Amino acid sequence: MTDIQCVIFDWAGTIIDFGSLDPVLAFQSAFNAAGIQIDTDRIRQDMGIEKHEHIAKLAKMPEVQRAWFAKYKRGITDADQLQLFNYFEQFLLNRLSTETTLTPAVLQVQTYLKAHHIHIATTTGYTKAMLAIAAKQAGLLGYHPELMVSKEDVAAGRPAPDMINHIMTAFNITDPQTVVKVGDTVIDMQEGKNAGVLTVGLIESSSLLGLSQAKLIDLPQKTRLAKFAEITKTLKAAGADYVIHNLSELPAILAKYQTPQKEHA
């Protein structure tokens, strides 16, 4: 049995922003400002990758290119993409500054990890500027990871394993099976699998579900169960070793990998 040494969390949809609503709203607002409508599902399908890359992927979608050409009589340029990103970034920075809340059980899980001497780290699709504000606001609410990594710290963003590898090196961890990646997207699971670590997917707060806590509560039981089953299947297909409803279920999974001596230390 191998003790878990580090748990690496995603941010939006995992630690903050139940339903990962803010990035979707920011992407839609950026394209709406340019007169282009984008469906929420199309935005969410690549959720978790670095945000410049996400803008570029959205700009390459055939329906976006057709709408852009119809409006502007030309294709989308690099300058257009930069303008879209700048709008997106400012919108999201404002949301992070004013709307950041923790998802349920974050602080309880943090207490568990610290009590068991397990490192806490994060990876993200946020830029450093976004991460700085998210970390500051989450810190005011009591969440304090030891190490936070963005794509700007490494050669390649998610789903590449570079950010996780960076964290393992920083903590002198050599066995990836002593590391757990927790996230709410397909990209999170792929990142974890590419790094060879254990992966845990979240359902209730996830981008895949895409609902606020209030809307989740109002969801009919039959619909809820069907959606949960679909998300579980999606996360498992992406490489999730475990799929849980929310973070309150994480300690029970981690306990399976702790030696009795450490469990009762």
From Swiss-Prot:
The keyword Lipid metabolism belongs to this UniProt entry's keyword annotation: no
CC cofactor: Mg(2+)
Gene Ontology process terms (BP): DNA repair; organic phosphonate catabolic process
InterPro entries per the UniProt record, alphabetical: HAD-like_hydrolase_sf, HAD-like_sf, HAD_sf, PGP-like_dom2, Phosphonoacetald_hydro
EC class name: hydrolase
Enzyme Commission designation: 3.11.1.1
Gene3D superfamilies on file: HAD superfamily/HAD-like, Putative phosphatase, domain 2
Upper lineage: Bacteria, Bacillati, Bacillota, Bacilli, Lactobacillales
Protein name listed in UniProt: Phosphonoacetaldehyde hydrolase
Functional summary from the UniProt entry: Involved in phosphonate degradation.
Cofactor binding note of this UniProt entry: Binds 1 Mg(2+) ion per subunit.
Annotated Gene Ontology cellular component terms: cytosol
Active site residues per record: 10, 51
Assembly notes: Homodimer.
Organism whose genome encodes this protein: Latilactobacillus sakei subsp. sakei (strain 23K)
GO molecular function annotation: magnesium ion binding; phosphoglycolate phosphatase activity; phosphonoacetaldehyde hydrolase activity
